[in-house]
Amino acid sequence: MQVPRVKLLMGSGAMFVFAIIYGWVIFPKILKFMISKQVTLKPGSDVRELWSNTPFPLHFYIYVFNVTNPDEVSEGAKPRLQEVGPFVFDEWKDKYDLEDDVVEDTVSFTMRNTFIFNPKESLPLTGEEEIILPHPIMLPGGISVQREKAAMMELVSKGLSIVFPNAKAFLKAKFMDLFFRGINVDCSSEEFSAKALCTVFYTGEVKQAKQVNQTHFLFSFMGQANHSDSGRFTVCRGVKNNKKLGKVVKFADEPEQDIWPDGECNNFVGTDSTVFAPGLKKEDGLWAFTPDLCRSLGAYYQHKSSYHGMPSMRYTLDLGDIRADEKLHCFCEDPEDLDTCPPKGTMNLAACVGGPLMASMPHFYLGDPKLVADVDGLNPNEKDHAVYIDFELMSGTPFQAAKRLQFNLDMESVEGIEPMKNLPKLILPMFWVEEGVQLNKTYTNLVKYTLFLGLKINSVLRWSLITFSLVGLMFSAYLFYHKSDSLDINSILKDNNKVDDVASTKEPMPPANPKQSSTVHPVQLPNTLIPGTNPATNPATHLKMEHRERY
């Protein structure tokens, strides 16, 4: 079979170009197109089902800072903190009352989080441990009144002494009572000051309080948020434009917030954190709106990572330095006065939650060093306190994540309330939480065998084609160099077969003829077959040696 050198050159070149274009251009576009059609929130799709009812729980850890010297702190001493935790909960997320808008390509829903205590994972903790924390009603209430309604201080002080008789600045209570079951609030007094104080409970301004009967309430940090409405979202479905998948369009039926001084900080940026668009670029970051902070936060790319053998991207985030970053000045009380900005690594939540609370990373990680120095018992480090997300960009899948946040009291002395008049001014850590997920192989295999298997097959195919094309190009170059018109494959195979046949059929060499016409004795040849030395075929063995006399 004759292979013309021109055809071999053209065929090999075409194969090389095809491998490049198909492997690095066409196949990725086909794959992205297929993913974009599958990853949407269209009713009936698999992604919609997983998104609306997460089939597995997230882990939710709570770490509490127990104040070991409460009486001393009440007199102005430096707080000594003891971290207690984690108290482990299974967090189930679901979305209900879903309403689709086909024209706008959006879906509206109400988010619901359900926390179930996991006693096995919490061991040796049981939830019945007694914790000492700043009084969750007296301290925030007294500080807020002093800052915003100082004229009412005397009335509030008297009301607190009636509703919470003999109360101190720090409250000792069981963990489950503080966080879920609730501590008792007695509004049965007929005193005007007590009734005035309890008005905020009856009107629902204290969102953490649950009314038990006509005169009593139960206050807890998270009890009211458990298995209840946590906000109405409207997000893009991604059917018309896959890049907008999950993007928050409205929250609480409003297109933007009305909380911060500047409009830009009131905008919704990113998703609801439960879904992300596929095909993101690593420099785009991962943005999500967090209702607990009334703010959108963006995670930025840190480095490459892997999860169950699959490549991913590690993202992280922090609260930044609001004072130093001009874009964040709208989170200051007065954007024109930088002295009203919170310290580095913190965020003032007063406008969001209506109390003197500050958010930060756990143990003030990446925050102002003074925050750590103001209290004893903190040890900030990246491993335990940083936020991270291992994310697969092409499919938009978060393989594992840990969202960590600490809540602190912006504490100060209050002259009008006896138990609070000597408190030191500092930001006091109360507790921090971690919400995380690690996908098991049931779900990672969906990505592995639909995405990465296709990528691997494409990789093998394109490199195989490139290898074959390069071999063909080298043969073509050889033919052009030797000015041969074609590559005779049959001839090459035939010559190779002849060499093999000769090697297998050669017989041993016969002994040399002892009779010579010369007195010169020939060198004895070995009986091995060396090309050109066989006596039967070598013409030198038939030459006669002529004797010449010397002169």
UniProtKB/Swiss-Prot annotation:
One Pfam family linked to the record: CD36
Keyword Disulfide bond: yes
GO biological process: cell surface receptor signaling pathway; cellular response to pheromone; detection of chemical stimulus involved in sensory perception of smell; lipid homeostasis; pupariation
Disulfide-linked positions: 265-330, 294-352, 332-341
Broad class of the protein's primary localization: membrane
Glycan-bearing residues: 66, 213, 226, 440
Molecular-function GO terms, alphabetical: scavenger receptor activity
Keywords: Cell membrane, Disulfide bond, Glycoprotein, Membrane, Olfaction, Receptor, Sensory transduction, Transmembrane, Transmembrane helix
GO cellular component terms attached to this protein's record: cilium; cytoplasm; dendrite; neuronal cell body; plasma membrane
Extracellular topological segments: 29-459
Cytoplasmic side, ranges: 1-7, 481-551
Transmembrane annotation, as ranges: 8-28, 460-480
Region Disordered, residue ranges: 501-551
Function per UniProt: Plays an olfactory role that is not restricted to pheromone sensitivity.
PANTHER family in alphabetical order: SCAVENGER RECEPTOR CLASS B TYPE-1 SR-B1, SENSORY NEURON MEMBRANE PROTEIN 1
Protein known as: Sensory neuron membrane protein 1
Species in which this protein is naturally found: Drosophila simulans
